[in-house]
């Protein structure tokens, strides 16, 4: 059996351009592609944080160091310049590889410069007390309640019930 696993995530990138008349794809700064281990032509999912749109396309390399995140073709009707997006890539692997696999997670600033690197897909934004770990966002969790009240959430993880145990990659 093959499993589809997260291989890379560029978190909260800012869309710098959208061109309806360009032939498909998403243009991504070549430095970001390399740091995320994405190849030109690789399938990616784009999730627009501003409006909830979700689409699939393929990556093409933009000029290195430019910070470009360009939405091209029909997707430009769904995602606009200035929108925050998450760019996600998945890969298929057998069970043994999937259990060992560690994804690449990049955090970028408003100019799409890398401000953090990691391997934990649930990790909160670095130095952002308003962001919440994805695995702690469960009903009844005091950290979730604190986040909704605007209280800083970067604190020791709350013990999860056995049914919610998270196992770190080896």
UniProtKB/Swiss-Prot annotation:
Per the record, the pathway is: Cofactor biosynthesis; (R)-pantothenate biosynthesis; beta-alanine from L-aspartate: step 1/1
Give the Enzyme Commission number. 4.1.1.11
The positions flagged as active site in the entry are 25 (schiff-base intermediate with substrate), 58 (proton donor)
Record GO cellular component, one term: cytosol
Q: Which UniProt keywords apply?
A: Autocatalytic cleavage, Cytoplasm, Decarboxylase, Lyase, Pantothenate biosynthesis, Pyruvate, Schiff base, Zymogen
- What's one GO BP annotation on this UniProt entry? pantothenate biosynthetic process
Q: What is this protein called?
A: Aspartate 1-decarboxylase
The record's gene field reads panD
């Amino acid at each position: 059996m093959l499993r589809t696993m997260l291989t890379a995530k560029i978190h909260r990138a800012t869309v710098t351009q959208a061109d309806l008349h360009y032939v498909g794809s998403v243009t991504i700064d070549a430095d970001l592609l390399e740091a995320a281990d994405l190849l030109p032509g690789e399938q990616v999912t784009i999730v627009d944080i501003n409006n909830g749109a979700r689409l699939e396309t393929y990556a093409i390399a933009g000029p290195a160091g430019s910070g470009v995140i360009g939405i091209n073709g029909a997707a430009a009707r769904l995602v606009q310049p200035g929108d925050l997006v998450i760019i996600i890539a998945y890969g298929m692997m057998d069970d043994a590889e999937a259990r060992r696999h560690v994804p690449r997670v990049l955090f970028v600033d408003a100019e799409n410069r890398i401000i953090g690197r990691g391997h934990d897909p649930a990790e909160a934004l670095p130095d952002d007390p308003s962001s919440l770990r994805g695995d702690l966002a469960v009903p009844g969790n005091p950290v979730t309640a604190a986040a909704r009240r605007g209280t800083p959430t970067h604190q020791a993880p709350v013990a999860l019930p056995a049914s919610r145990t998270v196992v770190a990659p080896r």
